Amino acid sequence: MERKRYSKRYCKYTEAKISFIDYKDLDMLKHTLSERYKIMPRRLTGNSKKWQERVEVAIKRARHMALIPYIVDRKKVVDSPFKQH
């Protein structure tokens, strides 16, 4: 069985020279969340270790402040949770 090779990805936070990730900025955080609001791993997002840890802390803070749900019911899963209706 062959391993799936992932393409080389670059950290978008490093390239954009972002100095701080705010937990209230959901547009920035949505790129590292799956459709079920789970935190995606570094190998899929391309984030560096430093920025992945900062994003995780920001997402956990946003969950604590009820800006992002902890869990999503299977029946309520949508394609993109951040689309405006």
UniProtKB/Swiss-Prot annotation:
Q: Does the keyword RNA-binding apply?
A: yes
| Keywords, comma-separated and alphabetical | Ribonucleoprotein, Ribosomal protein, RNA-binding, rRNA-binding
Q: What molecular functions are annotated in GO for this chain?
A: small ribosomal subunit rRNA binding; structural constituent of ribosome
Q: Record's Gene Ontology CC terms?
A: cytosolic small ribosomal subunit
**Alphabetical list of Pfam families matching this protein:** Ribosomal_S18 (PF01084)
Cite a single GO BP annotation.
translation
tRNA-binding in keyword set: no
Its domain of life?
Bacteria
Q: Which family does it belong to?
A: Belongs to the bacterial ribosomal protein bS18 family.
HAMAP family of this UniProt entry?
Ribosomal_bS18
Role this protein plays: Binds as a heterodimer with protein bS6 to the central domain of the 16S rRNA, where it helps stabilize the platform of the 30S subunit.
Q: Describe, as the record does, how this protein assembles with itself and its partners.
A: Part of the 30S ribosomal subunit. Forms a tight heterodimer with protein bS6.
Protein name per UniProt:
Small ribosomal subunit protein bS18
